[in-house]
Design a protein with these regions (language model features):
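Extracytoplasmic/secretory soluble proteins
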Residues: 1-349
């Protein structure tokens, strides 16, 4: 393999991932050597003494000395400095990428059906009233909700990322203000106003009231739904490769897959990037230095291992050999594409 390592990989079901992690941490016998944690769980397990302090290992690492890191790497890594069991800030995890952010996708077919000019939406910075007016037009045309979100609150920072136009500048939890003081964002007027906007949208039939129980997969299924009574038309979800995934899934179901990723509305200003999930070495590991050197420090080696982490395994997820690949079905049936020798291409999964 590219890593040269022999290890056991445990991959719990996505929806029950942190329940599985919590169960594994109940005993030294079941605690893994390495675990992938989101920001909240990362801070929690670090403060409880379950994670190995990799600060010194990072400072002397080949990756840090390589000169390969981009200018934003410091921002990613500084966010990983959290309090340990002794209250001292240290680096207990490593993330080889930025956290990404959610953006809002609107189905063009829904705009068209509601008589909304695409040119008035695409590439425009809308204010909330204009945006909400478009949502009401689409709801009136379809006769039901427009948005079905994966919960009213996300389970990781920044928490408000699945309904950004409604939360706007509100903060769900404590944050450091411009004076350097920590304040309770949930108790502020901005949050009260945000909750009122959400309540109004539910009462107006804009937001699916079942959003409170939705998982991410439930919300995606409603966006892909071929049932006109349950299909949603506006979905705030991850940017980047997820845009292609959403389009592919819509096409597979025979739905129009043209999506418009709108700019952040005026009151929001910018989509908020989450703190990247990070790879952590637990205190149960018998050789944390070795794990760091051969598992963590090779993730951004600029070669085969980095390629593995970014694109998957050659011959399984991608290849460069000359071949004709049959793509997944869409509304027009199967399609094939031919690649020349040396041409990078993904393989259907």
């Amino acid at each position: 393999t590219a890593t040269g390592l022999d290890f056991q990989w445990t991959r719990p079901d996505h929806s029950g991932y942190y329940d599985a992690v919590a169960n594994a941490f109940n005993s030294d016998e079941t605690m893994p050597d390495v675990v992938l944690l989101s920001s909240d769980y990362y801070a929690l397990y670090a403060s409880n003494g379950f994670l190995w302090n990799m600060t010194d290992a990072w400072n002397s690492s080949e990756t840090k000395k390589s000169g390969r890191l981009i200018s934003t790497a410091d921002n990613v890594l500084s966010a990983l400095m959290v309090n340990g069991e002794d209250g001292t800030k240290a680096m207990y995890g490593f993330s080889p990428y930025r956290g990404n952010a959610c953006c809002t996708y609107i189905k063009k077919a829904w705009l068209d059906a509601a008589g909304i000019n695409t040119a008035d939406v695409e590439g425009k910075t809308l204010d909330f009233n204009t945006y909400y007016g478009y949502l009401k037009q689409m709801a009136a045309n379809k006769g039901h909700y427009v948005i079905s979100a994966p919960g009213f609150i996300s389970n990781e920072a920044p928490y408000t990322n699945y309904l950004p136009e409604f939360y706007q500048q509100a903060s769900y939890t404590f944050y450091k203000n411009s004076s350097g003081q920590y304040v309770d964002g949930f108790a502020e007027d901005k949050m009260k106003e945000a909750l009122q906007r959400i309540q109004t949208a539910v009462n107006d039939g804009i937001i699916d009231k079942e959003s409170v129980n939705n998982s991410t997969s439930n919300a995606r299924d409603k966006f892909y739904s071929t049932d006109a009574g349950s299909e949603s038309g506006v979905f705030t979800y991850w940017a980047g490769t997820w845009a292609n995934t959403l389009k592919t899934q819509l096409a597979t179901k025979g739905l129009d897959n043209e999506l418009i990723a709108i700019k952040p509305i005026k009151e929001l200003g910018t989509y908020v990037e989450r703190i990247a999930p990070c790879w952590c070495i637990t205190t149960a590991a018998k050789n944390p230095e070795g794990i760091f050197k051969y598992f963590i420090d090779t993730m951004l080696d600029g070669g085969d291992v980095q390629t593995l982490w970014e694109y998957g395994a050659k011959g399984t997820h991608w290849d460069t050999k000359a071949e004709t690949v049959t793509l997944a079905k869409d509304d027009e049936g199967k399609k094939t594409k031919t690649y020349e020798e040396g041409q990078f291409h993904f393989l259907p999964q």
